[in-house]
A protein has these predicted regions:
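An aromatic- and histidine-rich active-site surface loop
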Residues: 80-116
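Short acidic/histidine-rich motifs immediately flanking catalytic phosphotransfer sites
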Residues: 74-80
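N-terminal subdomain of nucleotide-sugar transferases
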Residues: 1-41
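Short beta-strand scaffold positions
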Residues: 82, 149-150
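A short, charged, and often flexible helix/loop element on the N-terminal side
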Residues: 37-70, 121-128
């Protein structure tokens, strides 16, 4: 089996490294196409101010054309895997994945909406920003073929939060390095 880990996933956190190591240990061939959008950003919820947000937006704007081109030209994998955080990656990956008939899986790991709105209360739950974030994440979850979190409890919570079909979200434990 060949898996292509694709996108702007955060290499500063161990999650992607652990998944790759586990897949390789299981005999799965793993290739990577990655853009370092999150380099130097430890806590994504702390990207504040116009300059910080514009810098991140510019990184994305420059990353996606190259990522998309490389994905379109890469040898066809059996599975296209999007790493955490991946909300925007899901839209691009599923577009190309559908054209190339490649199933897309997303390691959601942590819901952005749940973290920013419900847990940290950084924006009002009924505000327009919260509604936009909820809608964006819900649409991303519905586009991918497979979504998974770090635990079954989180998977069930995401299903309820985003009105997904029961048992539609799986779980893969984080593990240790």
């Amino acid at each position: 089996m060949r898996v292509l880990l694709w996108g702007t996933y955060d290499t500063g956190k161990p999650r992607a490294r652990i998944l790759c190591k586990g897949m390789r240990a299981a005999g799965i061939e793993v290739e990577e196409i990655h853009a370092r959008v999150w380099e130097g950003v430890e806590d994504k919820s702390q990207v504040t101010g116009l300059v910080g947000r514009m810098r991140l937006l510019a990184r994305w704007a420059f990353a996606y054309p190259r990522l998309t081109w490389r994905l379109a030209r890469a040898p066809k994998p059996d599975l296209l895997l999007i790493g955490y955080p991946g909300v925007l990656d899901a839209f691009v990956a599923t577009f190309v994945g559908r054209l190339r008939k490649i199933p897309v899986a997303w390691d959601v790991f942590i819901s952005l909406y749940d973290t920013i709105v419900e847990d940290r209360k950084m924006i009002r739950p009924n505000g327009i920003a919260a509604r936009l974030l909820h809608g964006l994440e819900r649409r991303a979850l519905r586009r991918v073929d497979i979504a998974f979190m770090d635990t079954q409890a989180h998977a069930r919570r995401i299903e309820r939060l985003f009105d997904l079909p029961p048992r539609s979200c799986g779980a893969v434990w984080v593990g240790i390095e």
